[in-house]
Amino acid sequence: MAIQRTFSIIKPDATARNLTGAINAKIEAAGLRIIAQKRIRLSREQAEGFYGVHKERPFFNDLVTFMISGPVVVQVLEGEDAIAKYRTVMGATNPEQADAGTIRKDFAESIEANSVHGSDAPETAAEEIPFFFSDDEIVG
């Protein structure tokens, strides 16, 4: 496998409970490096743009409202097979179905407030990373 980069968001439910450090520890324990990170508050426009792929889905407005409800931590992660590895560390979207020890099993409050987002494919990561980070903000 090759070294990849992936994108992560620590969502408002997790930042509100001061879980950034605990989530970062799980990321690093999995062998992924955090090569860019910043804590921000998304505007409605940013959230709508980022989640635009879901615009026609019934949950879109609730998702946007949730994502602007508090600070988030956006990150670029790097490592061997980073996309698949981070998806394993995150666990299933529904925390009730997530494996023990995953971020969502340990920290998520619900399927909506599931603590983290991660890119699902190289193409997605290639779009999501520059949405929040310029090249000079990523320190490999």
From Swiss-Prot:
SMART domains: NDK. Its main location: cytoplasm. One of its GO terms (cellular component) is cytoplasm. Belongs to the NDK family. Its EC number is 2.7.4.6. Pfam families: NDK. Major role in the synthesis of nucleoside triphosphates other than ATP. The ATP gamma phosphate is transferred to the NDP beta phosphate via a ping-pong mechanism, using a phosphorylated active-site intermediate. The lineage of its organism: Bacteria, Pseudomonadati, Pseudomonadota, Alphaproteobacteria, Maricaulales. Its cofactor is Mg(2+). One of its GO terms (molecular function) is nucleoside diphosphate kinase activity. It catalyses: a 2'-deoxyribonucleoside 5'-diphosphate + ATP = a 2'-deoxyribonucleoside 5'-triphosphate + ADP; a ribonucleoside 5'-diphosphate + ATP = a ribonucleoside 5'-triphosphate + ADP. This is Nucleoside diphosphate kinase. Homotetramer. It is found in: Cytoplasm. Keywords: ATP-binding, Cytoplasm, Kinase, Magnesium, Metal-binding, Nucleotide metabolism, Nucleotide-binding, Phosphoprotein, Transferase. Gene3D superfamilies: Nucleoside diphosphate kinase-like domain. InterPro entries: NDK-like_dom, NDK-like_dom_sf, Nucleoside_diP_kinase, Nucleoside_diP_kinase_AS. GO terms for biological process: CTP biosynthetic process; GTP biosynthetic process; UTP biosynthetic process. It comes from the Bacteria. NCBIfam families: PRK00668.1.
